[in-house]
């Protein structure tokens, strides 16, 4: 559960991301694909090379979903319900992959925002991404 301080940290950190959300989302996907090759399984039709249009487009989708979630921290289940249905019932993404993407996103944010990525912000973002992952996997049962 995100505390008031966590929510404040998440909103402030995501605000620093600003217009870079889509490129950071794509970079996080690239990191995940390179670091955890089994995650490529769900993207057999994508060109997964560096800078590909498909990875950029999917990175933008990830970033848009996270931006929406940041704007609705008090109702993540309601906000992400459609995405949860999609990933559980249609795409059947391995729940572990959300943790791997979360890790890759944290590394990406730490790389681009080193002065703002304090231990407290890191912890708050980690909790937030864990909550998002929990919501996205909640309909797998």
Swiss-Prot record:
**Record's GO cellular component, any one?**
hemoglobin complex
Any idea which residues bear N6-succinyllysine here? 7, 11, 16, 40
Q: Which residues carry this modification: Phosphotyrosine?
A: 24
Q: Which residues bind heme b?
A: 87
Task: Name the consequence of residue 5 to T.
Answer: In alpha-1*2 chain
Using the record's annotations, give every residue carrying the modification Phosphothreonine.
108, 134, 137
Q: Which GO terms describe its molecular function?
A: haptoglobin binding; heme binding; metal ion binding; organic acid binding; oxygen binding; oxygen carrier activity; peroxidase activity
Tell me the protein family, please: Belongs to the globin family.
Question: Under what name is this protein listed?
Answer: Hemoglobin subunit alpha-1/2
């Amino acid at each position: 559960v995100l505390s008031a301080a966590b929510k404040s940290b998440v909103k402030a950190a995501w605000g620093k991301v600003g217009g870079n959300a889509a490129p950071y989302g794509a970079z996080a996907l690239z990191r995940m694909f390179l670091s955890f090759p089994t995650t490529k399984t769900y993207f057999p039709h994508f060109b997964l090379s560096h800078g590909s249009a498909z990875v950029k487009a999917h990175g933008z989708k990830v970033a848009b979903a996270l931006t929406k979630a940041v704007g609705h921290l008090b109702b993540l289940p309601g906000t992400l319900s459609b995405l949860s249905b999609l990933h559980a019932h249609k795409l059947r993404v391995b729940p572990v992959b959300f943790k791997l993407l979360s890790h890759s996103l944290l590394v990406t944010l730490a790389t681009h925002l080193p002065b703002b990525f304090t231990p407290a912000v890191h912890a708050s973002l980690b909790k937030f991404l864990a909550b998002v992952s929990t919501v996205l996997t909640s309909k797998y049962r």
